[in-house]
Amino acid sequence: MTDGGLQADAPHLGVVVSVRGSVVDVRFDTHLPPIHTVLHADEGRIIVEVLAQRDAHHVRAIALTPTQGLARGMPVVDTGGPLKAPVGKGILSRMFDVFGNTIDRLPAPPDIQWRSVHRAPPALARRSTRSEVFVTGIKVIDVLLPLERGGKAGLFGGAGVGKTVLLTEMIHNMVGHQEGISIFCGIGERCREGEELYRDMKDAGVLPSMVMVFGQMNEPPGSRFRVGHAALTMAEYFRDDEHRDVLLLIDNIFRFIQAGSEVSGLMGQMPSRLGYQPTMGTELSGLEERIANTDSGAITSIQAVYVPADDFTDPAAVHTFSHLSASIVLSRKRASEGLFPAIDPLQSSSKMATPGIVGERHYALAQEIRRTLAQYAQLKDIIAMLGLEQLSPQDRNVVGRARRLERFLTQPFFTTEQFTNLPGKLVSLEDALDGCERILRDEFKDCPESALYMIGKIDEARARKTEAIDVHES
């Protein structure tokens, strides 16, 4: 590696004494490197990070690069410092790996500094305690699950329910319609998705306000374990030095926990429940607590959380839940019904949905919507057995409102225009609340449910109904 972040000032030499997969034991006769020090072998092509000092002369390190070609007896150089990430205005619009090397086939950015990826969370006195709503332009989130500026939201779901699509739409809305920086951190996900995201953001013209950092699934566990810290270091620079608001999107936080589990197993630690590392809570807290709202700016984080086998009692999901101000659960059933985004409003929750923060009108509307959807969920079994006709008129009205609300809360995304042939829609909070309120007042009782599906503002439903009548008459 040739970047300035990993050069040694006064190298201390060690020698490899053991290689077991990604775990490397190194002997130093004079100076034992501290924990988190980066070591180079094979002329800098193999990079490892010290995780344990075994005795007065031996350290155990985890490889951040593949260890092919590494052998006992090879010399190892102590760089004298930790893993570092590039920061500065020059990193905008660029794509990096965990070492700060550019991976977008463009020259290295000028005017950058290098900072350690191991940084303490902001002090309690510096944290801001104001509760502000972060508007996304996505109806179902802004109305029922308002996100917190400087908070953490999790997108929980199994494979293929739309977590990555929802993340990319939020990037589009944040960069295109708000003055902020977006940092996308890909942890252990598919290389294809990263490349597609880069091209999509470039085509959308939002790349100048973005930074992308990737440690993909083909890379060693050490690399996937550290890439989240590298992305956070960049986010902290824009918050603290540039006084900008940052949207940090992590896809996927489960892969960070999974990489930590692999590292823990390789280091010989006793596994905990379901094979997870015993230090999972500490490792996750070390990452999550750095995401904070301070007096100089805010880092708002939205994290995709893969749920193994859709089991929400999995320790990885349980530990992640405890750090979040909003939990957005994506439902496979809703996805199969074509209700996108496939967010389950009854399973999802937000700490911001209180009258003191969002206001009395918004809170009352959100509660009424939840109540209507919950009543519909209870009536579904009766409808399946006896049919809609067997319900009382009052219950039939509830079902009609709930079905129209479900369809109104769907939304065409900018990032899926090429697949759906529907133009993307950004909906203001006021328009979304107005639409839900009018549906609950039965203003659209005569409107077919299909007219409310995949629209932006509620008035588009009337236009669709008129178009349908004109087509039918002609």
Curated annotation (Swiss-Prot):
Q: Which PROSITE patterns match?
A: ATPASE_ALPHA_BETA
| Topology of the protein relative to the lipid bilayer | Peripheral membrane protein
Q: Name one GO cellular component term.
A: plasma membrane
Catalytic activity of the protein = ATP + H2O + 4 H(+)(in) = ADP + phosphate + 5 H(+)(out)
What is its EC class? translocase
**Keywords for this entry?**
ATP synthesis, ATP-binding, Cell inner membrane, Cell membrane, CF(1), Hydrogen ion transport, Ion transport, Membrane, Nucleotide-binding, Translocase, Transport
Q: Which GO terms describe its molecular function?
A: ATP binding; ATP hydrolysis activity; proton-transporting ATP synthase activity, rotational mechanism; proton-transporting ATPase activity, rotational mechanism
Membrane spanning stretches: none
> Quaternary form?
F-type ATPases have 2 components, CF(1) - the catalytic core - and CF(0) - the membrane proton channel. CF(1) has five subunits: alpha(3), beta(3), gamma(1), delta(1), epsilon(1). CF(0) has three main subunits: a(1), b(2) and c(9-12). The alpha and beta chains form an alternating ring which encloses part of the gamma chain. CF(1) is attached to CF(0) by a central stalk formed by the gamma and epsilon chains, while a peripheral stalk is formed by the delta and b chains.
Return the protein name.
ATP synthase subunit beta 2
User: What species was this sequence derived from?
Assistant: Polaromonas naphthalenivorans (strain CJ2)
Taxonomic lineage of the native organism: Bacteria, Pseudomonadati, Pseudomonadota, Betaproteobacteria, Burkholderiales
